[in-house]
Amino acid sequence: MATRQSVDHFLEQCEGALRFAEFEFNEASRQEHYEDEEFQNSQRYIEEALTDMERLYASSNAQQRDMLARMQQQLNGMKNEMVLLRH
């Protein structure tokens, strides 16, 4: 079973990945192709967070799964926005 501390720490990491992705998304929206590497890195961090979440989800209780599911929605939303951006 996942500990509360491990889930909280993971959610903090996800929030960091989201902030980085949002920043890069906003920059890419304004600058087009100038920072492709950073934009791609932020997409990779989102993907890694989603992959790690699958493992953690399996060992979580119902309350933790709910928190993880909400974060998963946010990560998937950002991932989709980044894919759809004409970058």
Predicted regions and their residues:
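Short E/K-rich amphipathic alpha-helical oligomerization segments
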Residues: E22-S59
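N-terminal acidic leader/helix
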Residues: A2-E35, Q72, M82
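Short, charged, amphipathic alpha-helical segments
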Residues: D8, D36-E47, R65-Q73
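Amphipathic alpha-helical coiled-coil segments
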Residues: E48-A62, G77-H87
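Short, structured coil/loop segments at alpha-helix boundaries
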Residues: R4, N61-R65
